[in-house]
Amino acid sequence: MAVKKAALACSVCGSRNYSITANSNRTKRLELNKFCKHCGKKTLHKETR
């Protein structure tokens, strides 16, 4: 079971605001509502690999 580094990118402006360690066995990409400092509000962030 390998742990892989990934980033969470804002779906509005595209900036990569958060870095996470994720299990590579997961098939779907992680989607979370997080605060984007560039947009100034909570937006949907999607996992980028």
From Swiss-Prot:
UniProt cross-references to Gene3D superfamilies, sorted A to Z: Ribosomal protein L33 (2.20.28.120)
Keyword Protein biosynthesis: no
Assigned keywords, A-Z: Ribonucleoprotein, Ribosomal protein
InterPro entries: Ribosomal_bL33, Ribosomal_bL33_sf, Ribosomal_zn-bd
GO MF entries: structural constituent of ribosome
GO biological process, one term: translation
GO CC annotation: cytoplasm; ribonucleoprotein complex; ribosome
Domain of life: Bacteria
Similarity annotation: Belongs to the bacterial ribosomal protein bL33 family.
HAMAP family in the record: Ribosomal_bL33
NCBIfam families, per the entry: PRK00504.1 (NF001764), rpmG_bact (TIGR01023)
Protein name per UniProt: Large ribosomal subunit protein bL33B
Gene coding for it: rpmG2
